Amino acid sequence: MSAEVLEQPVLGSRRLSNYLVAAAVSIGGIGFLLASLSSYLGRDLLPLGHPAALIFVPQGLVMGLYSIAAALLATYLWYVIAVDVGGGSNRFDKAAGVVTVSRRGFRKPVLVEIPLKDVKAVKVEVRDGFNARRRVALRIQGRRDMPLTRVGEPLPLAQLEQDGAELARFLGVNLEGL
């Protein structure tokens, strides 16, 4: 961090949990495909169980449809991971007087530029419960709050407070929400 520019990377969809889900869906889809083919061919293609004993219509056919659904879902998940949807950065440039929030989207990048003079405060939002939310956002004059933290897994409270305080100190604005 220099005295004039602060850049914060934002983690997108390249998280361990997304890799594990995509791998599980892929393996499950292959299992359903092999079970369906075993049922159709009358030979066991899977080392576990005896899918050749299944009647192709309707059981083997339905497993084939499950394998198609799993292949489509796995393709989507691997694409989201490859593109790193949601990843990007927050750049605060005092010299240029601008905040730049950039994220990677499905088809094109999302780029939002906000003049520093419009930033009124840094807001730390903590909501616990079933749908927990922990985020740092910019309070902007005449606009809705601009979230700065990643989507998904909530940040630890200590890190959230530290990030909010560091950003408020850098921008010279108040810290709200604690």
Curated annotation (Swiss-Prot):
It is a multi-pass membrane protein. GO terms for cellular component: photosystem I; plasma membrane-derived thylakoid membrane. Keywords: Membrane, Photosynthesis, Thylakoid, Transmembrane, Transmembrane helix. One of its GO terms (biological process) is photosynthesis. It comes from the Bacteria. Its main location: membrane. The chain crosses the membrane at residues 19-41, 61-83. InterPro entries: PSI_Ycf4_assembly. It is found in: Cellular thylakoid membrane. Seems to be required for the assembly of the photosystem I complex. Belongs to the Ycf4 family. This is Photosystem I assembly protein Ycf4. The gene is ycf4.
